[in-house]
Regions:
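Conserved class I S-adenosyl-L-methionine
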Residues: 1-47
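Class I SAM-dependent methyltransferase SAM/SAH-binding core
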Residues: 52-98
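A short acidic, Gly/Pro-enriched loop at the edge of an enzyme's catalytic core
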Residues: 100-109
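A short glycine-rich, Lys/Arg-flanked "PGG" loop and its adjoining helix->strand segment in the class I
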Residues: 127-139
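SAM-dependent methyltransferase
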Residues: 144-219
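C-terminal lobe and adjacent flexible extensions of AdoMet/dcAdoMet transferase-like proteins
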Residues: 215-262
């Protein structure tokens, strides 16, 4: 998984208002998964982005590790943590590198949110990522994963999506556009170019863009791969007609550390 080098500088224009601050980001998941954690529970956000969720969780007194494959995202997470006055560990690591930095079976909760899993390279890369997350969880620990409904994304075909309103951050407006390149077969590499066009005070437009690789997956394939990684779905919001969904899966109590994908 790679990318989010350029976009790390403008990522707040891609975050919804409901998750824009650390407090708001943590609140989104509090009632469903975070509120039941014991004090000082250990939590990993393994695709932390600019750190709103990780910092929000740390503000609740949780022992948080924030990881991302993008150096820029990790730097921004550290800056947000410093600004909020909270302590967390931030590290640059792709999913398959996480077990090299973190001890197996030590986390109560792992987050993989923000549609991040679609950047894992194909079915093999996706399974490897899920296995890495699973092995870091304590038996009975939970993985929280959010995803686009890739069935709907593919059905819509290649297209340009321009947001229908200006997005305002830091007293500056931007137009955000998504350029989708959808391939014929599920297993092919798809592409998404995101453009954030910032409108300067003098009326000039400054665009920041990045082309990202995507490997979409069907919901039933995700559930099967979770099972292969030793994770059992506890709850899901998947609806064939909804744009996205949330899955909570727990690591099997009786299963040992998953073998890495080959």
């Amino acid at each position: 998984m790679a990318g989010y080098g350029a976009l790390s500088d403008v990522y707040e224009w891609l975050i919804g208002d409901d998750k824009l601050t650390p407090a708001k980001a943590a609140t989104v998941y509090y009632s469903d998964v975070v509120g039941s954690l014991p004090p000082h529970a250990r939590v990993l956000d393994c695709a932390c982005g600019t750190g709103q969720l990780a910092v929000g969780l740390a503000s609740l007194g949780l022992d948080v590790v924030a990881a991302d494959a993008s150096d820029g995202m990790v730097r921004r997470t550290e800056k947000v943590a410093s600004k909020q006055g909270v302590s967390l560990r931030a590290l640059r690591a792709s999913w398959d590198e996480l077990p090299d930095h973190l001890e197996d079976s030590t986390f109560d909760l792992v987050f993989c949110v923000g549609n991040s899993l679609g950047h894992a390279e194909g079915a093999a890369g996706r399974l490897s990522a899920l296995e890495a997350m699973s092995r870091l969880l304590k038996p009975g620990g939970r993985l929280v994963l959010t995803s686009r409904n890739w069935e709907l994304v593919r059905a819509a075909g290649s297209r340009v999506d321009v947001r229908d309103r200006l997005i305002r951050r830091h007293d500056r407006d931007s137009v955000v556009s998504y350029y989708w390149q959808i391939e014929q077969r599920w297993e092919q590499e798809h592409f998404l170019e995101i453009v954030v066009a910032q409108i300067e005070p003098d009326g000039a437009v400054r665009a920041c863009s990045e082309r990202l690789s995507i490997w979409p997956y069907r919901y039933e394939d995700l559930v099967a791969q979770l099972r292969s990684a030793g994770l059992t779905v506890q709850s899901t919001t998947f609806n064939p007609e909804s744009d996205g969904y949330l899955v909570v899966a727990s690591r099997d109590q009786a299963r040992g550390t998953p073998e890495p994908a080959r």
